[in-house]
Amino acid sequence: MAAAASSSSAASAPRSGEDIREAFLNFYAERGHQRMASASLIPEDPTVLLTIAGMLPFKPVFLGQQQRPAPRATSSQKCIRTNDIENVGRTARHHTFFEMLGNFSFGDYFKQQAIEWAWELSTQVYGIDPRNLVVSVFREDDEAEQIWRDVVGVNTKRIIRMDEADNFWASGPTGPCGPCSEIYYDFKPELGDDGIDLEDDDRFIEFYNLVFMQYNRDAEGNLTPLANRNIDTGMGLERMAQILQKVPNNYETDLIFPLIQAAADLACVDYAQLDDKGKTSLKVIGDHSRAVTQLICDGVTASNLGRGYILRRLLRRVVRHGRLLGIDKPFLVTMGEAAIDLLKGAHPGVIERQEVILAELQREEARFLETLERGEKLLAEVLASRPTQISGAQAFELYDTYGFPLELTQEIAEEQRITVDLDGFEVAMEEQRQRAKAAAVSIDLTLQDAIEQVAGDQPATAFKGYDALDHPSTVQALVVNGAPASTASAGDVVQVVLDSTPFYGEGGGQVGDRGSLSGVDVIVAIDSVSRSRDVFVHSGRMERGHLAVGDTVNAQVDRSCRRRAQANHTATHLLQAALKQVVDPGIGQAGSLVDFDRLRFDFHCPTAVTAEQLAQIETLINGWIAEAHCLEVQEMAIDQAKAAGAVAMFGEKYADVVRVVDVPGVSMELCGGTHVANTAEIGLFKIVAESGVAAGIRRIEAVAGPAVLAYLNERDAVVKQLGDRFKAQPAEIVDRVTALQEELKATGKALAAAQAELAVAKAGALAAKAEAVGEFQLLVERLDGVEGAGLQGAAQSLADQLGDGAAVVIGGLPDPGDLGKVILVAAFGKQVIAAKLQAGKFIGGIAKQCGGGGGGRPNLAQAGGRDGAALPGALAAARSELAAALPQS
């Protein structure tokens, strides 16, 4: 029998989501696994829209397409899945965004070790009682069952054999595959071990999946053992948090619930008091807020295609569910700020990209609110004729022309007890698809299509740029003004393919060269060079003359641009070497940009580089520059290069023979870019910024050479302007700004306190206007010029003065000159609540008369509206309704 988790391990088990994640990664790091940062939600695999599983970044390694980053690895991978989007919020465990904790073995340990560690982690680190655990194995995997039974000690009755559909993993119809074993948590172990049904979602939740990749499946379905067997595992962070935090669903864990509470506060509702429909809306908002924040952080923008459409759909679902809760003002930015605050610890990139995230949320929400307003007007016109059904054509027009979601049309129609012709909608949708398909046939080739068309017919371009900056070449193909052509004339925008070129084509993070092509009375200004496979494409404009396929031209690189790019590229190599020396020898490159006037280097690192470390790095690099190291460049076999210690980038594909750039004693890297001959040519190096771009990925931006002087001059000018403005010497500026900040902070606090006191003071004069209704004190009054928090304070103060029988309703315009914003607050005493009147429910109904809604707690609630002209009538209705509802004796 498996040993029970010790009481000490259970007592000290991690509980917060942050601790659960860190405990997993530390557990496997202590067992020789390299900690890998989460990859982007935008995968490198072009066949996959979004990162949907923890193993996806390692798929090329599992398939033998890339070398392994280490024998063992562990990660917490950001994932997005939208295939079950309609179940989000309705079930306990469906999400769009989630984190998958994983440990991976690439030809290293296998089944027994994976099982033993999974059990040790679950019972000893997480402190789960083995009596709460059940495991599943593939029906034919006798080895896994034997390990669970004889090595780990699990009761045979709690080892369940499952079919291939549940417990056999495959990357596709052919290729690596193997059985898997899953660990389930049993919420009701008291029901016993007989007749266990793992499909009982109320009793069991699967939280850890172990995949044993041990076979290769051929086209005929035959399985043969793999030479190198792999382990791929996944543990849902949110699921483990639900188990350890002992909450009824994933949404009520500390990974999501703070966002649900933020949304509830915006809607002035109490999550615990809501019905299932209201709770579902809050869960959708909480879940989707995490998803959209991470998607935008990783570079997705809202659109009608691909990832952009997924983002747009999620954003619009958040807005729609907010409206269902009575939130009728823009609130995505507020939810975005809450999500950033919640995620920033594990995903610092959201802080660095905060401005981008919030701007995209604001822009897309504003666009959708305009859409909703237009669509609601049209829908109101349709409903005004009191139809029994909204036709499919009408619903499709709302969807296609106004972007009005079908589900929102259904919800509004349902409120009016009207149906929507869904079959007719599908017919209209299919007709539109067919029209789009027919139209697509006649669309002209895009520029990229044209480039790929002409480049696809050409052999690889011979690159001469390592040894020469000008070279005679023959024009092989032309794209003129976006279309393939055989000739070009002055003024034309062109893409030119040459048989050979000294121009460096953009690649390896380095931008393409600039320069010119010239011939007899012909000049082409080249402003960029890209690559289409191995063909170099020179883009620019015809400055003079005529150019034709077959012409000979002199290709000349802009020497100044090349020198600056070379200096920045070599400086990037020195930067990586310095990071390894100062911060961590295990630091690996995650990306880079080498431009003419700046450089950027992204690298795997779990924490920010400190100011002291940045200073050390700068000093080290400038020292190497001053030492005037001569670079050595040579080609060699990939295995020989790696054996010599050359640094390669994980995920990059390399040929059998590679180019090695060596700064002797400092840096050795596989690199196809251009470099200085001697480090002294770089001149100077200066770091200008360090930031986080994603979980576990940091970025350093820097300048080198003449750009350093330009940067320092610019900074000096800023310091001079600040000194003039503050009438201070440069050394005094920081102290002056700090003092001003403290003064501003103190003034803000004093102003807020004064406003709150003023609101309570204004309200104090209203207490005398209360009227007796039986044993109750009824007060309904107007108080303009006070914001929501102040109005709540005033209402609560009045209720306290009037006692347990107080029924207080205060309404007003925060800005008396703006009729577009109304605030209503209700504060009820204990006796009023005992009389079955609740502030939250009551004020929401009154606010509808002002074109709004809201709610809150039984004793205190706030609502809003958009029609200030209706406020007097709404307050009169509140007075009469309360007077009628309060018991008279």
Swiss-Prot record:
The residue ranges crossing the membrane are: none
Return the cofactor note field: Binds 1 zinc ion per subunit.
Q: Among its keywords, does the record have Lipid biosynthesis?
A: no
The record's comment on protein family reads: Belongs to the class-II aminoacyl-tRNA synthetase family.
Q: Provide the reaction this enzyme catalyses.
A: tRNA(Ala) + L-alanine + ATP = L-alanyl-tRNA(Ala) + AMP + diphosphate
Q: Which Pfam families match?
A: DHHA1, tRNA-synt_2c, tRNA_SAD
**Which superkingdom?**
Bacteria
Q: Which InterPro entries match?
A: aa-tRNA-synth_II/BPL/LPL, Ala-tRNA-lgiase_IIc, Ala-tRNA-ligase_IIc_anticod-bd, Ala-tRNA-synth_IIc_core, Ala-tRNA-synth_IIc_N, Ala-tRNA_ligase, Ala_tRNA_ligase_euk/bac, DHHA1_dom
Q: Which cofactor does it need?
A: Zn(2+)
Question: Which coarse location class applies to the principal site listed for this UniProt protein?
Answer: cytoplasm
Binding locations of Zn(2+):
H569, H573, C671, H675
Annotated GO CC locations: cytosol
Record carries keyword RNA-binding: yes
SUPFAM superfamilies reported in the protein's UniProt record: Class II aaRS and biotin synthetases (SSF55681), Putative anticodon-binding domain of alanyl-tRNA synthetase (AlaRS) (SSF101353), ThrRS/AlaRS common domain (SSF55186), Translation proteins (SSF50447)
**What is recorded about the domains?**
Consists of three domains; the N-terminal catalytic domain, the editing domain and the C-terminal C-Ala domain. The editing domain removes incorrectly charged amino acids, while the C-Ala domain, along with tRNA(Ala), serves as a bridge to cooperatively bring together the editing and aminoacylation centers thus stimulating deacylation of misacylated tRNAs.
Q: Which gene encodes it?
A: alaS
Provide the function of this protein: Catalyzes the attachment of alanine to tRNA(Ala) in a two-step reaction: alanine is first activated by ATP to form Ala-AMP and then transferred to the acceptor end of tRNA(Ala). Also edits incorrectly charged Ser-tRNA(Ala) and Gly-tRNA(Ala) via its editing domain.
Quote the protein name from its UniProt record.
Alanine--tRNA ligase
Quote the NCBIfam families the UniProt record gives.
alaS
At the top of the EC hierarchy, this enzyme's class is ligase
Q: Where in the cell is it found?
A: Cytoplasm
Q: What is its EC number?
A: 6.1.1.7
Biological processes annotated in GO? alanyl-tRNA aminoacylation
